[in-house]
Amino acid sequence: MKEIVIKTDKLTKRFGDFIATNEITFEVVAGEIFGFLGANGAGKTTAMRMLCGLSKPSSGQASIAGFDIYNQTEQIKKHIGYMSQKFSLYEDLTIKESIQFFGGIYGLTDKQLKEKSESLIEQLGLKDQTKKMVGDLPLGWKQKLAFSVAILHHPKIVFLDEPTGGVD
């Protein structure tokens, strides 16, 4: 039997009288690629934010990696990577500081962080750029860095919000 890693049942998010997501129900099994398609304002980002534990649903149920989105959000965050459409990077940090910051959030040990930082910097071809401010990077580099820090801790599930916007 295939492992269900995301399961929703009538997941709804309201902002006052406005319904951003209306009773969405689906399942995603391990290894499956799943995507939301829709016009701007259709609720794709809202749905992802609920699934990542960043926004509380108005009603419905969901579990991510076996954890309930209402009362196990911290456990969910340890098992997912999330790259928002704004890249979730701090413009006033250097490349190296960004990697260390996100590694710390994901609970990597100092040893893991050192190894992963060096490996990531090498893979991205940024060895001579580690002191460069994120705000000074071209959009494509920001996107590569944002994706890289989202998967730094080898999450079970990765959420990508508009992952191809601005790719060179």
Predicted regions and their residues:
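Catalytic Walker B motif of ABC-type/P-loop ATPase nucleotide-binding domains
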Residues: 158-161, 167
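Conserved ABC ATPase "signature" region
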Residues: 100, 104, 111-129
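Conserved ABC ATPase signature
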Residues: 133-140
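Hydrophobic anchor residue at the start of the ABC signature
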Residues: 147
